[in-house]
């Protein structure tokens, strides 16, 4: 995904140069309206490894090149059997098919289609036994295709045959660790995994690492509640170590007992030795999802909450309107009347899930006019709407009077080609 975002960033410059100008930004016919976004329809696919779900995958609307996805790696034992869990949400899954390719995508080693998916609670379960002769310690690309009423959704992971990698132990440890951090009584047992350089009370929640104090690791006095469960995603794994990323959402009550929402991302590097897991590295970033309905105003500006210091923002010449980006959402702020408007967001106001809240996209502000209109570029993975599941670049114009953001141009991205709408 980082490769795609980097490619999108490079193509963004080319795209802007090719489409820049007032005629495009202001006079083109509208092709989309952010208020008309349909709900996400693509299911999620995960791997069930000894009753622990790992490697959550999101659907793409078109086949991607085999070497494009480095989001996850799924280890295989000698049986070469895998169990997949599909969360269909409201979609009907007609069939599950998969394809194994060499890592560069040049050769198809195996492809099969499975129509009998087993219903298990909220999930559909699929058992796969890979029949191809896979070399030990060599990565292969696996493409999964779900046939839906809305079309076909594609999912990607890498598979590798390695012995004694303890993948399920690593995944279970990550799940235990992050859940224990949310429980003060359980968190006391985490001290042996840390290398604290401070022992004071928690004063920061955005840049936590293995050298942070136990109080900081366990969220200090924030008392958060789990809102969206995390699924461990294995990034790298071998016979001695593993790197795992976990993303989840928390809520917390502020001093006025109002609910705040946080996007959390954690990185774990671990070693399995002598029947136990050692934590080699731990990093956590927590970013608050901005909510304009909360008391965010101060005499000299607005409070963005817990986040990093690098803010994408732009103001008009008179400094009467300021546009800023936070957690994949675009906002406008008028200091004169202390008015905040949400300009663009994939997030649903209620009944949302990870499909609409994931931030594998970014926003670049191009211009803020004297009237408060905003031109901006959205690029990356499209969470929902008519372009759900595509990597793309869209130029938007926000009309402040109408409080509507409309897309005036859109381009799909592929690994080595583009297609214009």
Named regions from a protein language model:
Residues 32-54, 74-79, 92, 164-174, ...:
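Low-complexity, intrinsically disordered terminal/linker segments enriched in charged
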Residues 44, 59, 107-116, 135, ...:
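Short beta-strand edge/turn micro-motifs at domain boundaries
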Residues 63-88:
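Contiguous beta-strand segments within globular domains
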Residues 186-233, 341:
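Short solvent-exposed beta->alpha transition segments
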Residues 251-252, 329-331, 381-385:
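Short glycine/acidic-enriched loop and turn motifs that connect beta-strands
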Residues 305-318, 362-373, 419-421:
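Structural signature of eukaryotic scaffold interfaces centered on beta-propeller domains
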Residues 391-401:
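Beta-propeller blade signature
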Residues 411-418:
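Conserved small/polar residues in nucleotide/adenosyl-binding loops
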